[in-house]
């Protein structure tokens, strides 16, 4: 356990992001005093009009009052966020601060990236599929839900005006890039293909997603994670099952492997950007914080999340693929493989489904703020 002292620089969580901060004061566990920047002891409760307010007097109106009841028997730290106005200085518990080192710097940068990308993605309206809109704006939830349950076929709404979105493109094309027989398709032709881009999504899986939406947004529950059958396991099971069917065809086999590898990479990259409901963001951040997910150590999102989150990605694919440059042949190979994967999952729902659990009051108030 690291011991923190006044004047030390640390990383601190404030809302969903991590900032650089300096410890101005601290109170250790059961101590009956506060240690300030000069390593002097201060009383826990300020006496009214105390003359001992020395050099902090000029912003005394900003000083966050120390709350003895709240911090009883707990170690806590009075932080100043670097570059912020001192009115944001606050007392925080040990769970909010982290050592100032490379690994935590990586976490900080990843969260900064997520927030930027989230804004970029919202602006670009890449997500055009009704179901995915569900995850990004709350207005259409009820409406798209009705739509979701009424038809068993998801059709992309081809409205994304971002054909030049490289990242999005490369993620979705990489899955079948070298299977493209003819990548010089004219954009007109591809528009026709896209208007017919249908994914037959079995009604029983749609039902899972409707319930999933209800549990999280209405009942404020979370999928119980890490999943017993995480996504990489499901894809592995499916690969084994499909390999038996394709034994004689090495070309099809290599396409299958490419699609499944691409799907897993795509999931890991897109989870925090487009596949989580707002209420789940904090759960994801906690996984990062506790190293339950740590891409640097090869502990990936697909090792933790399960079938519900995989289905959210699959049902979004027509919308995501509407910005791709894949030709019609590759697209139809990809779509039919995804449909086959859906049927496979449908037959094994009892095995793969996860439970939902209520969150703690702390989680609930933080996640909704």
Curated annotation (Swiss-Prot):
Domain MRG: 193-368
Superkingdom: Eukaryota
Keywords on record: Chromatin regulator, DNA damage, DNA repair, Nucleus, Transcription, Transcription regulation
Function of the protein: Involved in deacetylation of histones, chromatin assembly and chromosome segregation. May act as a transcriptional oscillator, directing histone deacetylases to specific chromosomal domains. Component of the NuA4 histone acetyltransferase complex which is involved in transcriptional activation of selected genes principally by acetylation of nucleosomal histone H4 and H2A. The NuA4 complex is also involved in DNA repair.
Matching InterPro entries: Chromo-like_dom_sf, MRG, MRG_C_sf, MRG_dom, MSL3_chromo-like
Quaternary structure, from the entry: Component of the NuA4 histone acetyltransferase complex.
Protein name listed in UniProt: Chromatin modification-related protein EAF3
Chain intervals with Low complexity compositional bias: 126-135, 150-191
PANTHER family, A to Z: MORTALITY FACTOR 4-LIKE PROTEIN, MSL COMPLEX SUBUNIT 3
Protein localization: Nucleus
Organism whose genome encodes this protein: Candida albicans (strain SC5314 / ATCC MYA-2876) (Yeast)
GO cellular component annotations of the record: NuA4 histone acetyltransferase complex; nucleosome disassembly/reassembly complex; Rpd3S complex
GO biological process: DNA repair; DNA replication-dependent chromatin assembly; negative regulation of antisense RNA transcription; nucleosome disassembly; positive regulation of transcription elongation by RNA polymerase II; regulation of DNA-templated DNA replication initiation; regulation of RNA stability; transcription elongation by RNA polymerase II
Compositionally biased residues, Basic residues: 53-62, 136-149
One Pfam family, short name: MRG
Family statement: Belongs to the MRG family.
Lineage, broadest ranks: Eukaryota, Fungi, Dikarya, Ascomycota, Saccharomycotina
Region annotation (Disordered) ranges: 43-66, 126-191
